Amino acid sequence: MEFDRILIRYGELSTKGKNRKQFVTRLAHNVKRAMKDLPEVRIHGERDRMYIILNGEDHKLAEERLKPIFGIQSFSPAVRVNLELDEVKNAALALVQDVHEQNGTFKVAARRSHREFPLDSNEINQEIGAYVLQNIEDLSVNVKNPDVKLTIDVRKEGVFLSCRTIIGAAGLPVGSSGRAMLMLSGGIDSPVAGYLAQKRGVEIEAVHFHSPPYTSEQAKQKAVDLAAKLAKYGGEVKMHIVPFTEIQEMIKQQIPESVIMTVTRRMMLKITDELRRKRNGLAIVNGESLGQVASQTLESMLAINAVTTTPIIRPVVSMDKNEIIQIAQKIDTYNLSVQPFEDCCTIFTPPSPKTKPKLDKIERYESFTDFDSLITKALDNIETITVNITENTQVKDEFADLF
């Protein structure tokens, strides 16, 4: 069966009252980005639903693109016919024939908002149901638990029919809750944190710290590939790759070994916060899980957070490793994350890092070195790319030089 459109039902948008229009607009924007390589697709957003007009594009590919988009409760491939009963009958029969199985059951659920159509909802149910039964053997009616539910929506602009409902990703449209910077390493936790933030409508821009020659091009590419996995939830992800070698070397030379990780994280957070300011972000997201490593104790978090007043969102803070791994496997980032390429969080790691660093001592150690000039240099040399779901590739950002 060739479908000419897809009907999208909204998720939590139904509770957003006066702000509903901006949520619908944002969802339409994300859907458009996800359909970037389907040029004939057209999107029509209405108050209670959205239509994707396929114009000959592959409906199966369009369905795959819609499945991970946050803000969609469910969607159905559909066909539109004119307000003629014979056309409705023929389309209904073709739809049910396409999906029914031997000795299957079905139900017709009609809704008529266009009052000039000659039949009311109950009459449509009876007329179409009888026609389908007459033309398909070994098919029976079950109104409570049917194998196939044929929905018919009679509107002024035509009659819309569908018989398959696909569950969407739910949540809020990415970008509807504002923008945040995701500190994206090559590990398991940070992609999961990014995914969970996106589910609540946060548009993430990934920040990855690259320290060649200590970290390889493969490690950098792994981070880009992880960003591509996250891009499918909103259509694309902007990624900032920060040259971090000089800062890490200076930390290793000037800072006591036991607090190297604390100072390293502080420098990362300073850079991320400055990027957030330039990119008009509202928060920073990271993959910290309380007590998992030395830099993720409450005392360490306190010392690290002291460099900023920006909200730090930690979606996985209360999860254990197994819970995080389960989500990573679900979103298809786990196999990438466990590839054995070192990132800047694992180089220069001391054998016995402090789990309860003192902020006053940390600040004193840092005061003997001009880290600010190194941070400025790193910010001036950031590489910014855009990672697209449709291409799974990277495009150098034309505005990167603004940093």
Swiss-Prot record:
Pathway field: Cofactor biosynthesis; thiamine diphosphate biosynthesis
Catalytic reaction annotation: [ThiI sulfur-carrier protein]-S-sulfanyl-L-cysteine + a uridine in tRNA + 2 reduced [2Fe-2S]-[ferredoxin] + ATP + H(+) = [ThiI sulfur-carrier protein]-L-cysteine + a 4-thiouridine in tRNA + 2 oxidized [2Fe-2S]-[ferredoxin] + AMP + diphosphate; [ThiS sulfur-carrier protein]-C-terminal Gly-Gly-AMP + S-sulfanyl-L-cysteinyl-[cysteine desulfurase] + AH2 = [ThiS sulfur-carrier protein]-C-terminal-Gly-aminoethanethioate + L-cysteinyl-[cysteine desulfurase] + A + AMP + 2 H(+)
Biological process per Gene Ontology, one example term: tRNA 4-thiouridine biosynthesis
Principal subcellular localization: cytoplasm
Residues the record lists as binding ATP: M183, L184, H208, F209, R265, G287, Q296
PROSITE patterns, per the entry: THUMP
GO MF terms held by the record: ATP binding; CCA tRNA nucleotidyltransferase activity; tRNA binding; tRNA-uracil-4 sulfurtransferase activity
Listed Gene3D superfamilies: 3.30.2130.30, HUPs (3.40.50.620)
Residues covered by the THUMP domain: 60-165
Record carries keyword Lipid metabolism: no
One term under GO cellular component: cytosol
Record keywords: ATP-binding, Cytoplasm, Nucleotide-binding, RNA-binding, Thiamine biosynthesis, Transferase, tRNA-binding
Top-level taxon of the source organism: Bacteria
Pfam families: ThiI (PF02568), ThiI_fer (PF22025), THUMP (PF02926)
EC number: 2.8.1.4
InterPro entries linked: Rossmann-like_a/b/a_fold, ThiI_AANH, ThiI_fer, ThiI_N, THUMP_dom, THUMP_ThiI, tRNA_STrfase, tRNA_sulfurtransferase_ThiI
Subcellular localization: Cytoplasm
Similarity field: Belongs to the ThiI family.
Function: Catalyzes the ATP-dependent transfer of a sulfur to tRNA to produce 4-thiouridine in position 8 of tRNAs, which functions as a near-UV photosensor. Also catalyzes the transfer of sulfur to the sulfur carrier protein ThiS, forming ThiS-thiocarboxylate. This is a step in the synthesis of thiazole, in the thiamine biosynthesis pathway. The sulfur is donated as persulfide by IscS.
PANTHER family: TRNA SULFURTRANSFERASE
Name the UniProt record assigns to this protein: Probable tRNA sulfurtransferase
Native species: Listeria welshimeri serovar 6b (strain ATCC 35897 / DSM 20650 / CCUG 15529 / CIP 8149 / NCTC 11857 / SLCC 5334 / V8)
Gene: thiI
